[in-house]
A protein has these predicted regions:
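Conserved SF1/SF2 helicase motif Ia
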Residues: 88-111, 126, 209-214, 227-229
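Conserved strand-helix element at the start of the C-terminal RecA-like helicase core
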Residues: 98-111, 303-333
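Conserved interdomain linker/interface between the two RecA-like ATPase lobes of SF2 helicase motors
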Residues: 232, 240-251, 255-319, 461
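Post-DEXD/H (motif II) to motif III coupling segment of the RecA-like Helicase ATP-binding lobe
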Residues: 188-219, 223-264
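Helicase-associated low-complexity/disordered flanking segments
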Residues: 1-57, 67-68
Length: 790
């Protein structure tokens, strides 16, 4: 790889783009002896597995002993065997069942094939069988699966919620009575709104297990010490900062019940990492300060060069449209070079492809026939594609966890591999180009979810009552708000309160299926349909708040490679009509926001400044969209503004906030020029802090919002708010409240290191700002943060 990197540095387009180069050394594998059933030994040997890695053996031993397990090792480290071995052992010994849950059907398809092959290797008489139960099967296929009674069932949280738990007593009693193992794959994916929903689903699952006394066979055998209704939980995770705490939060199990296995003992070769920062535009090219050349174009150059050089390469990018476009462009460039065979074997991979097409590309990567792929993060999940020579990251994927997962696809045995991260121009990308140590040496991000979100809890309590009557002790599943929620639902007529010999019980007394009245992926039920005005076909569905932001009259809406203009928004019928256009501009809404502090829940004095108190609170955020701005697509400069009349929205959520001491405010105002200097300083500090949330937590910058004001009625002084962008909050700002000094310090470092003069997309400008990034004072924001934390 050293020679290849030198060759890249000699290419005509090279202009000093390599900002950092590191080599992660390889290692030899370490193994452990595990006593296995002879049938399982034979099946594993037929699959090429002669011994278990030490980390696999540790996990197997822990599950055998009745512990819950978190296995947090990198991509391609063999996590699946850690749960497959005990699952198959229990099926062989006792006909016990295992429930495997993954967030994506593509991963389930891959696991079903792998586990089914291993089960067949055990022989027909073993009684071990594998089946998936997802939305991909029709009614007859699902009936056949239930009649067959597989010992290992693979499903998604959505199907567990909609199709299994509501029928646990009528259709699935045979499964839950023998359930000993629950496997949660990709547990790090259960964060934010989705993670909060799924955490409640798993608490409902635990209630059902208790009703069926799941795990009883294991407890009566020589293995395990579980309590009644308590199957073993095996959680597989990417490398995150809080694997045990997150697994406990998601599953509802005690953190002390989990055994952590996080040392990868599989063999790897050396991985060469390049941080590739595209050059800035020349001053005469019509772009603002700090603007850099496209990461897509830079990635394509590397992709074409490396594929032509014989390296099997995958480029990860964020959107389906980019993957499709640049796969086509890359193949065209290869043909222009005379590389016709390689060009024929370059493809795009994304979730919208059919299962068959995705499988063809996966098999081609595994066999080596496919030479290059442009992919969304769909290939980031644990689908088996073998090892690659090169992985390119077209822009920082948003979290270090995702970057290492994607980069972990590189590596063929112990051969050297290359990972190049090509930076975009936004804050996170440029921060990491300037602070590579933070990427390689800091603790991984934490996964955050909130299973006590009071906006979600009532729907899940209704669903739980529909699945199995409630009792007063169920607050151990649903937390402190449970009694109040039950009282409210009883008063509303959704629950029927009964006194029995065993105590109080609440039965579901509502209409229909509460499970089907909610989605696990969203909060709130009002949606707006976007349709093509030419034919009435639906283009997309947005939540009400998102529709006001993205589908207002005059908005440019981008969907699957096509631009549309919103020509009408009918909020009486919740329908927006769109027409295809080819504009040279994009749009961004303008809005006014106010925040009301409803209740302060926690407070702390800033450790670096004893006159600053940081608080965590319940707040109400009211937003009024007032208009929108048009921006030139090439230069990013504003070219026109229009007013809008849309309804106000209210978000009840959680926030951290802090005030600026009067002395510091006076110093900032004195150092500035004009009345907008201080408002610009606190506004820029707010933007910068929000932009760096994903460095500490697994989230997107749009998951949080902010407000800075020179005088707030609750505090009567200058105040900066940062709030969760979802009703009830998902735990992000609560966790940030606990580490706010680190967040401020990182933001200060970003502002100081950015070479721009007055603010740019790499430091304080935000693509989501409702005030058109005005005013912003980057230098004064740095002075403000320095006064707070230094």
């Amino acid at each position: 790889m050293d020679e290849t990197i030198r060759w890249l540095q000699g290419r005509p387009y090279y202009d000093g783009q390599i900002a950092e180069r590191r080599v992660i050394p390889g290692r030899e594998a370490t193994f452990a002896d595990v006593d296995l059933d002879s049938r399982l030994v034979s099946a594993l040997e037929s699959d090429g597995v002669e011994r278990l890695y030490d980390h696999q053996a540790s996990a197997v031993s822990a599950v055998r002993g009745g512990d819950n397990v978190v296995l947090a090792t990198p991509t391609a480290s063999g996590k699946s065997l850690a749960y497959t071995v005990p699952a198959f052992e229990r099926a062989l010994d006792e006909r016990a069942t295992t429930l495997y849950i993954a967030p994506q059907v593509a991963l389930i398809n891959d696991q079903e094939e792998t586990l089914s092959d291993l089960a067949h290797g055990l022989g027909f008489a073993s009684g071990v069988s594998v089946a998936q139960y997802t939305g991909r099967q029709d009614r007859k296929e699902k009936e056949a699966i239930r009649e067959r009674q597989p010992t290992v069932l693979l499903t998604t949280p959505d199907m567990l919620h909609y199709g299994i738990m509501p029928h646990a007593h009528r259709l699935w009693d045979w499964f839950f009575e023998r359930l000993e193992t629950v496997v949660i794959d990709e547990v790090h994916e259960y964060r934010g709104v989705f993670g909060s929903h799924v955490a409640m689903v798993f608490r409902r699952l635990q209630r059902i297990c208790e009703r069926f006394d799941a795990g009883d066979e294991r407890r009566s055998s020589s293995r395990g010490t579980g309590s009644p209704g308590d199957p073993d939980w095996v959680c597989c995770s990417a490398t995150i900062g809080n694997p045990v705490d997150h697994a406990a939060t998601v599953t509802g199990q005690s953190p002390d019940s989990f055994r952590l296995v996080d040392e990868d003992t599989s063999a790897t070769g050396p991985t060469h990492w390049l941080f590739w920062n595209p050059p800035e535009y020349d001053a005469g090219e019509g772009f603002g300060s700090g603007r850099r050349r496209s990461s897509h174009v830079e990635t394509k150059r590397l992709f074409v060069d490396l594929v032509a050089r014989g390296y099997q390469t995958v480029a990860f990018t964020r959107s389906r449209q980019v993957a499709e476009r640049y796969a086509t462009d890359s193949a065209s460039d290869l043909r222009d070079r005379g590389e016709h065979e390689a060009a024929r074997n370059v493809h795009a991979y994304q979730a919208a492809l059919t299962d068959e097409r995705r499988g063809e590309i996966e098999d081609g990567l595994d066999s080596g026939e496919v030479r290059g792929v442009w992919s969304t993060n769909a290939l980031e999940l644990g689908v088996d594609i073998g090892g690659l020579d090169v992985v390119l990251l077209d822009g920082y994927p948003g979290t270090r966890m995702a970057a290492f997962q994607q980069g972990g696809r590189a590596g063929r045995g112990t051969d050297p591999s290359l990972v190049a991260m090509v930076a975009g121009e936004d804050q996170l990308d440029q921060y990491l180009m300037a602070h590579p140590r933070d990427f390689f040496e800091n603790d991984p991000e934490e996964a955050i979810s909130n299973p006590e979100n009071e906006h979600l809890l009532p729907d899940h309590v209704r669903a739980a009552a529909r699945e199995n009557w409630l009792r007063s002790g169920d607050d151990r599943y649903f937390g402190e708000p449970f009694p109040d929620v039950v009282a409210d639902l009883t008063e509303a007529g959704d629950l029927d309160r009964r006194t029995t010999d065993a105590g109080l019980r609440w039965l579901y007394d509502g209409e229909g299926s509460p499970q089907h009245e909610m989605s696990l992926r969203t909060i709130g039920d009002r949606e707006v349909q976007l349709r093509d005005r030419r034919n009435g076909n639906r283009i997309a569905t947005l939540s009400f708040a998102d529709a006001l932001r993205d589908a207002h009259p005059g908005a440019i809406y981008h969907h699957q490679g096509q631009d549309f203009e919103v020509v009408d928004l009918d909020l009486r019928n919740d329908v927006a009509d769109l027409a295809p256009v080819r504009p040279n501009y994009y749009t961004q809404v303008l809005h006014d926001k106010t925040i009301t502090v409803e209740e302060d829940r926690r407070e702390q004095v800033l450790s670096t400044h004893d006159e600053v108190t940081v608080r965590f609170a319940d707040v109400s955020m009211r937003k009024q969209i007032t208009g929108f701005e048009r921006y030139d697509r090439q230069s990013g400069e504003p070219i026109g503004r229009e007013a809008l009349e849309l309804p106000e929205t209210t978000l009840d959520t959680e926030a951290l906030y802090f005030t600026v001491p009067g002395e510091i405010e006076r110093e900032i105002r004195a150092a500035g020029d004009g009345p907008d200097a201080f408002p610009g300083a606190i506004h820029a500090a707010e933007h910068g802090m929000i932009s760096l949330f994903p460095l500490s937590f697994l989230c997107d910058r749009r998951d949080v919002g902010g407000l800075s004001t020179p005088r707030h009625p609750h505090t009567d002084c200058a105040t900066i708010f940062v709030y969760d962008g979802y009703p009830g909050g998902v735990g992000l700002t609560e966790r940030a409240y606990e580490t706010v000094v680190d967040l401020m310090g990182r933001t200060l470092g970003m502002l100081r290191d950015c070479p721009c003069e007055s603010g740019c997309p790499a430091c304080v400008q935000s693509p989501h700002c409702g005030n058109a990034n005005d005013p912003l004072e980057k230098g004064l924001a740095a002075d403000l943060l320095a006064a707070l934390v230094e």
